[in-house]
């Protein structure tokens, strides 16, 4: 059973390595070995190098898979995640604004960002969700001059057609 679990751990390492673009000879695999002291474990290198590319893969005595990365790599990963999150948010806001037919996109964007900053200042929790549809609806209600009035345009077109 232990060999089967060990094989599954290595299969998972293969899968993760492949998705990260790591070749077999580039990955570092270590075993986490318990000692007499329950507060201490020894790391035993199984393949690769202690100078190898990250992440490093560790397998404990229960065949559970662990990874290890440097603070520098972890910080870069967090920053990349935050950048992707911001880009996603910006794209969603842009889409919502365009769906409401702005007269001047950048004016609506500035008002929306000001509203978002106000909401963020009121929130104690840094992670909060904003209903962008509702936000833009409120902006449209408070600043109707920033958006094209479709009903008005249709009435104007009908009245011209009737003339």
From Swiss-Prot:
Pfam families found in the cross-reference section: DUF2603 (PF10788)
Xref: InterPro entries: UPF0763 (IPR019724)
Origin superkingdom: Bacteria
Record-stated family: Belongs to the UPF0763 family.
Name of the protein described by the UniProt record: UPF0763 protein Ccur92_13550
